């Protein structure tokens, strides 16, 4: 077991007591690490999930302010999670959680638009890119 991780693969990095919780759903450690490096501001508490199925359940429990999802995550995919959240939000606007999608190619931006995400960033991304996308998503 890695330091800071429990058996379920979740890691909590609390950066401030009154921080906005950002959920990061990615099965690749480098993607989660890059998002963490970009969001080291004291304004954010980051919650990681490497399994999209357990992450979907945790969204209701954790109620994050925003979610960052890798497009290619496990066998489910970030698109399916984003679509599920978007459809749920259409039924109950109060439950809408903005999503930032991490894309593999710029050409995938049409997928992000179709999923109804608040913002997207194409890999490889800079810290500035991901910070700007998350701030944009939180402002919606």
Indicate where each model-derived feature is located.
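C-terminal output helix
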Residues: 125-134
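Conserved acidic segment of CheY-like receiver
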Residues: 19-30, 35-39
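Conserved sequence signature across two-component system core domains
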Residues: 25-26, 49, 67, 102
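Short hydrophobic/Thr-rich beta-strand motif most characteristic of the beta2 strand and flanking loop
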Residues: 43-51, 58
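Alpha4 helix (beta4-alpha4-beta5 surface) of REC/receiver domains from two-component response regulators
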Residues: 80, 101-121
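The C-terminal output helix
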Residues: 135-140
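His-Asp phosphorelay/catalytic-motif detector in bacterial-type signaling
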Residues: 90-98
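Conserved phosphotransfer microenvironments
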Residues: 69-88
């Amino acid at each position: 077991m890695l330091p800071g991780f429990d058996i379920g693969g979740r890691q909590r990095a609390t950066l401030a007591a009154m921080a906005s919780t950002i959920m990061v759903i990615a099965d690749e450690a480098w993607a989660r690490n890059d998002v963490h490096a970009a969001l080291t501001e004291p304004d954010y508490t980051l919650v990681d999930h490497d399994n999209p199925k357990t992450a979907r359940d945790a969204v209701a429990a954790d109620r994050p302010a925003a979610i960052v999802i890798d497009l290619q995550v496990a066998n489910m995919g970030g698109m399916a999670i984003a679509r599920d959240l978007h459809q749920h939000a259409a039924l109950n606007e109060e439950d809408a959680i903005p999503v930032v999608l991490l894309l593999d190619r710029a050409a995938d931006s049409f997928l992000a638009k179709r999923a109804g995400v608040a913002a997207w960033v194409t890999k490889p991304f800079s810290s500035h890119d991901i910070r700007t996308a998350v701030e944009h998503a939180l402002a919606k």
